[in-house]
Structure formats: C-alpha cells, structure tokens
C-alpha cells in the first residue's frame, strides 16, 4: 500500500518525469526585456563657443589644431605657449587638473563674492573680507561663524583643517576607488551620488556642460586671482571695489592704485 502511495505521489509515471510547471525560459521565450529611464532630450546649444565645432578664437595663429586638442582645449601654437599640451598623456593629465581646479575655483569665486554680498546686505558676519581672512584664521577663537560663538564649536583652525583633510580624503577616495557611493566609471566625472541633479543623463548636454565647466572654470580661476590682487592693493572685497568704481569711474579705477605701492592704503 505504501509503495502504491509513493508511486502515485512521485512526479514520474512509467519511468518518465512529468513536468509539474513550465520553466521561466519556456514562458518568456527568447525575448529580452530592457528597462531604461526616459529622459527628455535637450536640444544642443546654438552657441558658437560651447558646441562641438567651437570657433577657434586664435584665428591669426595657425588654425590647424593638434590631434589632441578638443574644442575645450585649443592647442594652437598661441594658445599653449608653455607647450603644456605637447604630449597626449600630459594633455590628458592637464585637462584633469584643469577640470578639478576649475571646479574648486568656481566655488571659491562664488564664496568670495557671496561673503561680500552678505556683508553688503547688512548681515553682520564676523568673518573678515577675503583679503584679511588668512590673517584672522590663524588667531585663536577667530572661526566663529555668523558672529555667534556657540554656533560652531571649532575655535581651533587646526581642528577644522584636520576635519577637512579627513572628509575630503574620504570623498576623493570614493571618487577614485569606488565604494558605498557606487562603482567608478570615470574618475573625473563620477556621476551616481556625485551627480545628484542628474546633469550627466543626456550625453549631448553633458558634453556641452563639460566645455562650459572648463571655460567658466578658467574664468573663475583668473577672476579669483584678480580678487586677491585687488584685495592686496585696495584692502577691499570685489563687490566693494565694483561699487566704488561704478560710483566714480574716473577716479576709482586701477590707475588710481598703480602709483600706490603701499598695500591697503
């Protein structure tokens, strides 16, 4: 009796296995299902400066661009006076350094202008202008943000420096080697958690944004240098100098300080 029950309950009759349920491959066949995110495609820019075939500004020089030069890094004889883009590997490294330093300079120029704008808007900030900040930071108890000593308990500039080293080291480590933020595809433009706004979804807009980033970053690096020189000479921030110049363009300009070799006076 037990043997008969076993025979009935087993999924094989007369030595042939009976299929209880079809496999997944039989149900779906050989079709492939792919899912992708639908992103609205933005039209490529009509700007002559940021498109792929950008106008070369150095028309008088030799117009034949080198093979390594893209639209963003014109390597004509006049553009790369120091021959920094002579070797392709060096050009790639220089482009990486330019993008990283340009992003930093864009943030720095925004911060220098924003601090001056906040001071102009009568928000009482205890921090000095961009010019005098380095001297004030080394003094003890100088890093009281927004004039409230209880807001940030980091009165030591060395403690702030150590925290910055740890935090930026961790972020840069994830950017280069991957980690909990996702795998690394391109270390210079990591994407994923590093791109919360999704600016790199559309490849055409992304290529145009890369060019704009490098061009605006070069402008920001040069303008930050100008802010420093202005602050050393005049002792004022960039917005104060702009307001003074607009108030009296004839007297308040660079020539008024060109004969003044004592900084800050």
UniProtKB/Swiss-Prot annotation:
SUPFAM superfamilies: Chlorophyll a-b binding protein (SSF103511). Keywords: Chlorophyll, Chloroplast, Chromophore, Magnesium, Membrane, Metal-binding, Phosphoprotein, Photosynthesis, Photosystem I, Photosystem II, Plastid, Thylakoid, Transit peptide, Transmembrane, Transmembrane helix. Chlorophyll b 5 binds at residues 164, 261. Photoregulated by reversible phosphorylation of its threonine residues. The chain crosses the membrane at residues 151-171, 219-239. Chlorophyll a 1 binds at residue 218. Chlorophyll b 2 binds at residues 152, 181. Coiled coil: none annotated. GO terms for biological process: photosynthesis, light harvesting in photosystem I; response to light stimulus. One of its GO terms (molecular function) is chlorophyll binding. Gene3D superfamilies: Chlorophyll a/b binding protein domain (1.10.3460.10). It holds the Pfam family Chloroa_b-bind. It is a multi-pass membrane protein. Chlorophyll a 6 binds at residues 245, 254. Residues 1-34 form a transit peptide. It is found in: Plastid, Chloroplast thylakoid membrane. Chlorophyll a 5 binds at residues 212, 230. Binds at least 14 chlorophylls (8 Chl-a and 6 Chl-b) and carotenoids such as lutein and neoxanthin. Chlorophyll a 3 binds at residue 213. Its main location: plastid. The N-terminus of the protein extends into the stroma where it is involved with adhesion of granal membranes and post-translational modifications; both are believed to mediate the distribution of excitation energy between photosystems I and II. The LHC complex consists of chlorophyll a-b binding proteins. This is Chlorophyll a-b binding protein 1C, chloroplastic. The gene is CAB1C.
């Amino acid at each position: 009796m037990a043997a008969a029950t076993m025979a009935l309950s087993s999924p094989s009759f007369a030595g042939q296995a009976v299929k209880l349920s079809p496999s997944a491959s039989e149900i779906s066949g050989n079709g492939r299902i792919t899912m992708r995110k639908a992103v609205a495609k933005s039209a490529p820019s009509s700007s002559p400066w940021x498109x792929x075939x950008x106008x070369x500004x150095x028309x008088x020089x030799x117009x034949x661009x080198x093979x390594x030069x893209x639209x963003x890094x014109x390597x004509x004889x006049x553009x790369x006076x120091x021959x920094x883009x002579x070797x392709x590997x060096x050009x790639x490294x220089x482009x990486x350094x330019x993008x990283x330093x340009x992003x930093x300079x864009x943030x720095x120029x925004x911060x220098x202008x924003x601090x001056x704008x906040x001071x102009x808007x009568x928000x009482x900030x205890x921090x000095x202008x961009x010019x005098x900040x380095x001297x004030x930071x080394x003094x003890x108890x100088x890093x009281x943000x927004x004039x409230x000593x209880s807001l940030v308990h980091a009165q030591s500039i060395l403690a702030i420096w150590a925290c910055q080293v740890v935090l930026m080291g961790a972020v840069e480590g994830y950017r280069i080697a991957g980690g909990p933020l996702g795998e690394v595809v391109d270390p210079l433009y990591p994407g994923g958690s590093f791109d919360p706004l999704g600016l790199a979804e559309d490849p055409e807009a992304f290529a145009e944004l890369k060019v704009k980033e490098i061009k605006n970053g070069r402008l920001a690096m040069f303008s930050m240098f100008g802010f420093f020189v202005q602050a050393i000479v005049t002792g004022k921030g960039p917005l104060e100098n702009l307001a003074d110049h607009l108030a009296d363009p004839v007297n308040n300009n660079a020539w008024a300080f060109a004969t003044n070799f004592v900084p800050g006076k």
